[in-house]
Structure formats: C-alpha cells, structure tokens
From Swiss-Prot:
Residue positions, PTM N6-carboxylysine: 201
InterPro entries, alphabetized: RuBisCO (IPR033966), RuBisCo_large_chain_AS (IPR020878), RuBisCO_lsu_C (IPR000685), RuBisCO_lsu_C_sf (IPR036376), RuBisCO_lsu_fd_N (IPR017443), RuBisCO_lsu_N_sf (IPR036422), RuBisCO_lsuI (IPR020888)
Species annotation: Lepidium virginicum
Additional free-text comment from the UniProt record: The basic functional RuBisCO is composed of a large chain homodimer in a 'head-to-tail' conformation. In form I RuBisCO this homodimer is arranged in a barrel-like tetramer with the small subunits forming a tetrameric 'cap' on each end of the 'barrel'.
Post-translational modification: The disulfide bond which can form in the large chain dimeric partners within the hexadecamer appears to be associated with oxidative stress and protein turnover.
Binding site for substrate: 123, 173, 177, 295, 327, 379
Major subcellular site: plastid
Binding site for Mg(2+): 201, 203-204
Protein name: Ribulose bisphosphate carboxylase large chain
Catalyzed reactions: 2 (2R)-3-phosphoglycerate + 2 H(+) = D-ribulose 1,5-bisphosphate + CO2 + H2O; D-ribulose 1,5-bisphosphate + O2 = 2-phosphoglycolate + (2R)-3-phosphoglycerate + 2 H(+)
Residue positions where Phosphothreonine is found in the record: 330
Cofactors, names only: Mg(2+)
Amino acid sequence: MSPQTETKASVGFKAGVKEYKLTYYTPEYETKDTDILAAFRVTPQPGVPPEEAGAAVAAESSTGTWTTVWTDGLTSLDRYKGRCYHIEPVPGEETQFIAYVAYPLDLFEEGSVTNMFTSIVGNVFGFKALAALRLEDLRIPPAYTKTFQGPPHGIQVERDKLNKYGRPLLGCTIKPKLGLSAKNYGRAVYECLRGGLDFTKDDENVNSQPFMRWRDRFLFCAEAIYKSQAETGEIKGHYLNATAGTCEEMIKRAVFARELGVPIVMHDYLTGGFTANTSLAHYCRDNGLLLHIHRAMHAVIDRQKNHGMHFRVLAKALRLSGGDHIHAGTVVGKLEGDRESTLGFVDLLRDDYVEKDRSRGIFFTQDWVSLPGVLPVASGGIHVWHMPALTEIFGDDSVLHFGGGTLGHPWGNAPGAVANRVALEACVQARNEGRDLAVEGNEIVREACKWSPELAAACEVWKEIRFNFPTIDKLDGQ
C-alpha cells in the first residue's frame, strides 16, 4: 500500500459504491416549512426497489452522485441533501410509485425558476435505474415564493386597467396564423375588436418572418386597436408577441410596444425560456405592460402520464416567473385536458391559498402569500355552443379565446366577434339570474339567437362539431 493510500485510509474515507437508500431514504424525516417538496411518479426498472428508486431521485437531484467522493467530507450532507421521505403505490399501477422528496431551501438561488428546475429535473430524468419519471407537483414554500416578483400586474390590476368587470374576457387568435401581410393582419385585428372582443392575439409562432416583420405588425395592430377603441368606447388590446431569438431583441420589441401605447405583449415562455420570461415580466411591471403567456411546447413535457412533468408544475413555475395570462386548456375543446385536473391548476394560478386535494391532482397545500394571480386562458377548438360550459367551468376570472370560432363565421370576423360577445353576455346574465348553465346552456344560447342573427348563423355552422376523444393524462384511479 502506498503512503498516499495509507493517509486517505487513516482519515476514514472509504471509496466505492453504496446504495442510495442508505443515505437519501429517510422515512422518519419531518418536513420543514422552508423545504421545497416534490411529488415524483417513479417507475423503477425491474429489480430496483421503490425505496432505492426514490432515494436515487433525491440524491441525483441534490447532492448525490453514483459513487462516494472524498469531498463529501468537506460539507454537511445532512444540511444540503434531498430526502425521499415517503413512498406510496399508485392505485391501479403495479410498477408505479409516488416518491415524495424534500429539498432544503439553501440548494436554490433566490428568484430563479431556471435554477430550481435545473436542480430538480435537470439530470435525474435520464437515470438508468428508472424506466420512467414524472414530476407531478411541487410545494413552493413562502420563504422561496417571496424571492420572486411573479406576475407583472395580476388579475385585479388588469381589470382596473381595462375597466372590465363581472364577466370573462373575450379574445381571438388571428388566423391563418402564418402568411398574412402586416396590413391584412391589422385589418383582421380591427374587425374582431370592433365586433366586441376585448383582445386579439398573435399565434405562438408569429415572431418576425419574411412575410410579416415584427415592427410592421406592431404598427398595423396598434392602428387597429386605437380605431376600434374610438368606435366602441371600450379599451382593447392585441397580444403582440415579443418572443425573439435573443433576450435583447425580445426587450427591444417590448420597448417598441410600450412606445406605441398598447396595453399588452406576449411571450412563449417554454420555448423562450424561464430566464427570458422573468426578464420580460420585470420589464412589463416597470413599464405598465400586461403580459400574456403562451405555453407552446408544453405537451412535449406534460402529456404522457408516466414521464415528464405535469402542467400544474409548469403553471406554478409561470406564476413565479411572471405572466398575467397563461393558456390552460379548455376541457371541452380540441386540446387535451381532464376537467378536475384542469380546475386544480386553474385554482393554483388564480387563488392565494390552495388546499391539498388529490381529487384535483393537487399533492400539496400551496400558499402564494402576496404573489398576484394569473388569468387562465381557454383556447383551442371552442365555439359558441361551448360558451355555457366555459363560463361555468372557468368563471369570471378567465379569458376565453375563439380563433376559428370567430374568424370562421360565415359572415366574417366582426359578425363572428358579435356572436361570441352575445353568447357570453347571455350566459353571464342567465348565471346571474340563477339559471344552471350546465343544464340549460344550450337553451340559453338558442334564446339569444332570436335577437342576434350573427349568433344564429354561428350556431348553425358549428352545431355538429365535436372533439370526442378520451383524455390521455387522467387522474389516478379514473
């Protein structure tokens, strides 16, 4: 044995590999109010015990690595390590388990969603001992939440800016999403806004392409906003997509939007990235701009039930990073969305305090303390016949977006907007009168058709449209 080896042995360092569960599985651990808690759906490889799999997740997403290292002795693992403190089987799934992991707050940089995700989900999802892994939920403690600005303005400030109360807001995505010139695009915006919508929207992939450069689009949309406001007496907006290839270019576009005096800009927060999104949210708060968030790419991450990350986690991350609106599915339209699960993360977006409720997929009680709420946006394959259900499901604090359901009207954009506004006002009035939208919804819409030919035409066009496909990402036990 060499002198160096003898020296290392004499200080008690023992090289080699040991089971993760010996260090990182701690069922006796009592979680702290300052811990970030995570619920992982773990599918171990055959032969790997769930305790070892859960401990491996805790280790590889905090202080651990595959072998013992001598530098472990230079820090306090007991202070900094993640701990798998509970494991439970998933009902109806023999090979899946929910592993609960607690992370000490000191592992994370203040005010950084980027760092939080890099730690918790950055590396462990490719671990060979796991056949699949999904992050189902996070508990963000108030001590960490308070390090974030969150949404630039929040629900109440937005309503005050727009002077609109007592009903959902109405929007429309301009179609076709790609190919229009800036002038024709602005014309479509104007027709929709003058017809009664509160907002129109750039689609997620409208940035600055050869057929329509961003500056031209911003100018023509601003003209449409001001003209429709003058005609209707209502405050209007268009979500000008500031998403760009660099953060500097993104902020430049937001600056130009502010100079035009428009009320709101937009960002694709997953493809753009959390660092860019947080920077834009800070700019929007400092400069009085509302911020609409599109979740493009989310289904790549959240759609499969056994691997990836549930959208409720992405929704919480957005509330931390900052956004005044975010797309949240429809339940009734063309996009994936279980009703109870959707209502669960809608609560997490809007409410100040949300209790644990496994029937809605909420694994932890979440206290947002003073962080403003986010308006959920229902968008994707919806039309006037969906209005009663959308009003009943999402309530007043929401934005209902009818893209094809506005521009697909046989008489044009403005009549399509009129049809949606009339249907919404009829549903809100009926609800306020005590009528049950879930039971009487179709009858309420038919009654409104008697005094709105635009709505009658829309109802005729879309009376047979259905999107009857089973939900893939169902809650456990369904």
